[in-house]
């Protein structure tokens, strides 16, 4: 009992974040929503208030941070996409060069001499 009194007097609360805390995340994902309700959506993306004359409120720090993160992610996606395209083009160019090299080797291969050269009959 003394331990309980000590715990209550310190005011420390320990919250359990187990499966019960994430209970609705699968349903939200199936509905096309964020797993965490504060992840994205109108409650986090739209301003909390606006002026009486209809002007929008200035963006808040969290909105600016999320916008910067999305822009950074989009830039990275574009950069990686460009790198993939450049790599694919380089690979295709190397494949074409290999084919041309094989053709050149076949054309420059040693030709038969002697009787076979004078009598161009069907090859064996």
Curated annotation (Swiss-Prot):
Pfam families referenced in this protein's UniProt entry, alphabetically: MRPL52
Region (Disordered): 99-124
Single GO MF descriptor: structural constituent of ribosome
Gene Ontology biological process terms, A to Z: mitochondrial translation; translation
Keywords: Mitochondrion, Ribonucleoprotein, Ribosomal protein, Transit peptide
Subcellular location as annotated: Mitochondrion
GO cellular component: mitochondrial inner membrane; mitochondrial large ribosomal subunit
Presequence boundaries: 1-23
Similarity remark: Belongs to the mitochondrion-specific ribosomal protein mL52 family.
Quaternary assembly: Component of the mitochondrial ribosome large subunit (39S) which comprises a 16S rRNA and about 50 distinct proteins.
Protein name according to UniProt: Large ribosomal subunit protein mL52
Organism: Bos taurus (Bovine)
């Amino acid at each position: 009992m003394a331990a309980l009194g000590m715990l209550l007097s310190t005011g420390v609360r320990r919250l359990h974040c187990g499966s019960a805390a994430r209970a609705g995340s699968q349903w939200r994902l199936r509905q096309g929503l964020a797993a965490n309700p504060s992840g994205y959506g109108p409650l986090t993306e739209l301003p909390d208030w606006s002026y009486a004359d209809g002007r929008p409120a200035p963006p808040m720090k969290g909105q600016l941070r999320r916008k910067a993160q999305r822009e950074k992610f989009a830039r990275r996606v574009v950069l990686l996409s460009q790198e993939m395209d450049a790599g694919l083009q380089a690979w295709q160019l190397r494949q074409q060069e290999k084919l041309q090299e094989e053709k050149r080797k076949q054309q420059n291969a040693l030709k038969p001499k002697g009787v076979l050269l004078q009598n161009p009959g069907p090859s064996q």
